[in-house]
Amino acid sequence: MHNISRRKFLVGTTKSIGLVAGFSLVPNILSAKEAINNKRWDHQLFLTMDTKGTATVHITKTEMGQHIGTALAQIVAEELEINWDDVKIDYPDSHKKWGLMITGSSWSINWTFDRNSRIGASARIALIEAGANLMSVNKDDCYAKESKVIHKLTNKFVTYSEILTRKSINRIFSEEELKAIKLKKFGEYRIIGKSLPSLDVPEKINGTAKYGIDAFIPNMVYGKIIPWPTRYGSKPINVDDKEAKKIPGYVGVYVNKDDPTKVNSSYVIALAETFWGAEKAAKAIKVKWD
């Protein structure tokens, strides 16, 4: 058996999931000078806003037809009090700073709802403070709605775009401050649960969307999981890849015995230089399961 080590597999191939668990809400904010030069405000790790007032939510879950990017962006936008037309999404790299980047079992909303809500809410608070300062009014007399900070006593307002154009926001929230933010109640939602245009549809229609099969980096290999007989308890006790070695481009086999999600026992992956090579190798490899 041509076995590939865990380290070699992760270093030498593209990864569809991140294997570092946990996340931090501690801000990844640019300095005032960097913010001006880059024309953007990085609030927390998963949200960036620019001087047009556009909010880009960084999605670290995989889009598989369920429009997860739109759903996660709705959570941020709800507390941010921003117009839906001012919201975008993107899919960042697989750097470990993003935490566990796995998608499945309806985890995405469950695991990130509170986090995304507090990201949006803290950004709203920072914008209200900056907007009140621009209008020379008390921040406690202001509220945010539809991409604007409004002074309750005079109805005077400044848009998020104006605020981000004229101010450099360096507001940092501690973990304690984030946890103390009062979030909206179910009956107060105006974005969550509403039928809104999906943010990823235009790219899918015009052909610019990048799918997993489109990904390519030099020297990458393709992997094909060999199904196990049962989800729990199945362990490979012998892997015979003699026939797979006859397939052009076959690289080896990776046996995973430490699933980071803890929802599967272990699995075997056939590796090859091409997609179809991996498909053929997976069928040729014989696995004896316990």
Regions found by a protein language model. Name each.
Residues H2-F23, K33-D290:
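Cofactor-binding beta-sheet edge motifs in enzyme active sites
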